Amino acid sequence: MHSTEDEYFELADFYKLFSDSSRIKILFVLLSGAHCVKHIAEKAEMSQSAVSHQLAVLRRSNIIRQTRSGQNITYSLADDHVKLLLELAIAHIREDK
């Protein structure tokens, strides 16, 4: 498989999103489905402001999506590729344990 130099940089930037444990916690909460900030904060044991900040980073990078229904906003994984990446990564980590 051959890629361009731009794709290498884009891929490196993509994987940097997974280098923050707070973002990983949030993504694992979202594996179970769409949630509001308050619920994500509770499940990830983080403050709502910290969760909101990380959600903005993930949303700008198209890792998650935001859905508004009236005044309610929920967040979910953008697609099954993100779910698969997380599942493969955790399987790899647990492989040697």
Where are these regions (language model features)?
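Short, intrinsically disordered or compositionally biased N-terminal tails of bacterial proteins
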Residues: 1-9
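N-terminal helix-turn-helix DNA-binding core of bacterial DNA-binding proteins
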Residues: 9-50, 69-80
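Conserved segment of winged-helix/HTH DNA-binding domains
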Residues: 15, 74-97
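Alpha-helical residues within the helix-turn-helix
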Residues: 42, 53, 59-60
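Generic helix-packing signal
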Residues: 48, 53-54, 93
